[in-house]
Amino acid sequence: MSIHLSVLGSGSAGNSTLVSISNQDNGQPDRRPFNLLIDLGLSLKQTRLRLEGHGVSIDQIDAVILTHLDQDHLRPVWRNTLQAHQIPVHIHQIHASAASRILAAETIVSYEEEIKLESIIKIRPVQLAHDTTGTIGFVIEAHSKRLGFATDLGHVPNELLEHFVDLDAIALESNYDPDMQRAADRPAFVKQRVMSGHGHLSNAEALDAITRIAARSNLDHVVLIHLSRQCNCPEVVSRLWQQQAPDLHARLTIADQHAPTELLQLGPPVAMAELF
């Protein structure tokens, strides 16, 4: 029994992550995994291609959960596909009204507290600051394994640190390098928004948060997501972690805008043939 995670793409041009959860039991040994997508910010074509690289098709997506409704996390083009495949989209109630103007009503599942999917999956949300409408982080739990996921958060509140305990893996935004942000050729109001505490996390803020979370977890994987194309680069991020958190650096994966990460496993090894 295991959880697999792949960030299909992450950045200002689009975000989507596959979480594939082993769904076998003694009565149904050949049952395929439960496939969950976090966010729908990539094009249909790119999502299909990147899923197929992991042996998953669109019609094998069982559910979607959204962090928030910015277009790099939800593209309106998904509306008809979600309807056609009858894929439920779980949306926190703070975003549900706005989502109804983008998605078909019958695909929207509004929630406030914990979500239970199948009999084995629990998703516990936490509200976070981002621009005016906020964003939602999650702990996804199955088979006694726990994945923490949060992106587009302006700062790391105590509520998130209290929520993200006993994790086996974490995916957290590491959006910008402050020096690159200040030097960037972009309007001052954009820089202020990003760095305001209601915009995005810097590399140092992400490292500090994950270091604190790691002290109360047993992390197999650390995945950094939503790197700014203009104000960050993987080399800067990797160097920071090598210098300040070398033990965690060995478990580090930096997500890319243009290619999916490998399937990262939480739990005991499972042969790929058994998964898909």
Task: Please place each PLM-identified region on the residue numbering.
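Conserved beta-strand hairpin/beta-sheet module of binuclear metal-dependent hydrolase folds
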Residues: 1-54, 136-151, 169
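Structured catalytic core of nucleotide-sugar glycosyltransferases
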Residues: 6-17, 67-76, 96-100, 123-125
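Active-site metal-binding loops of divalent metal-dependent hydrolases
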Residues: 9-10, 40-42, 69, 128-131, ...
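Active-site metal-binding motif and surrounding structural segment of the metallo-beta-lactamase
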Residues: 33-34, 43-91
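Active-site neighborhood of phospho(di)ester-bond hydrolases with catalytic His/Asp-centered motifs
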Residues: 37-41, 61-70, 90-93, 148-151, ...
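Metal-dependent catalytic neighborhoods of phosphoester/phosphodiester hydrolases
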Residues: 74-85, 101, 232-239
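Metallo-beta-lactamase
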Residues: 91-144
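Cap/insert and terminal regions of metallo-dependent hydrolase folds
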Residues: 158-256
